[in-house]
From Swiss-Prot:
Name of the protein described by the UniProt record: Large ribosomal subunit protein uL15m
Localisation per UniProt entry: Mitochondrion
Molecular-function GO terms, alphabetical: structural constituent of ribosome
Keyword Ribonucleoprotein: yes
Domain of life of the organism encoding this protein: Eukaryota
Protein source organism: Danio rerio
Pfam families from the UniProt entry: Ribosomal_L27A
GO aspect biological process, one term: translation
GO cellular component, one term: mitochondrial large ribosomal subunit
Annotated segments matching region Disordered: 25-59
Known partners and oligomeric status: Component of the mitochondrial ribosome large subunit (39S) which comprises a 16S rRNA and about 50 distinct proteins.
Membership in a protein family: Belongs to the universal ribosomal protein uL15 family.
Keywords: Mitochondrion, Ribonucleoprotein, Ribosomal protein, Transit peptide
Main location: mitochondrion
Amino acid sequence: MSLIKKPGGKTIEVVKNLPRITLANLRPNPGAKTLEKRRGRGMHGGNRSGWGHKGERQRCNRPRLGFEGGQTPFYLVIPKYGYNANHSRQPQYPPLSLRRLQYLIDLGRIDPSQPIDLTQLVNGRGVEIQPQKRDYGVQLVDEGADIFCAKVNLEVQAASEKAIAAVERNGGVITTSYYDPRSLQILIKPVPFFMPGEPIPKRLFPGEDLLPYYTDANNRGYLADPDKIQTARMDLAKKYGYSIPDISKDTLFEMLVQRKNPRHIFFGLSPGWVVNMADKKILKPTDDKVLQYYGS
């Protein structure tokens, strides 16, 4: 009669007989710590006391890492290409995946029956935006495009082509929009801005480097021609092999067609208005000069 061998039986027996780990037998692995070379001080320890001959090394004033004695260091000589030119001033866009967006909708943190912008995404703890670290919004990436099934009116700052196709395939609408740093701070934290009773400022237009992106219909830019956007939607549907649903008869049609004015920060709130949090009222300006300033 043969004995039945249990998988891992010998290993379990060895572990049972090993001593238990306690504070008394904890020690570094062999070779993890090396003893520092003992060097003499003053007249002791040999001719040069283990510090070599004169100079910076003997006097414990070693040069910084990468210093080559005054000549142009290697990392400045080769290569001389502008791969990282102005890297400290380039805008950052933290990624937001379609999988994460669907997860937030399924949990009820984000209401798909209302337009979704950065205010909803931040309040739903979906993304973290830090303008002081040059964050200019979120970038929608196509991770989870095969499981995304929500019909949304979404506003982001950048989006990949496949992510745009995944949103429009379900009958949704996506817009890429730019916010200057002050407008971005107001958008992600509206309540602290409303508390002092300041008027809502105008949103600024993007600079020369970002203007081509937000005027391109293929990127669904908020400054692009609406007719060109409709043509780009049809071309993208042909490319990925799906048909665009007719939203004109949809119950959420009014929500899906909502758009922000390029100068507006919030949905339904115009520049120059003051939100009174204490009385829960909205104060609108009546002076012609003020209206002309905020309307321009």
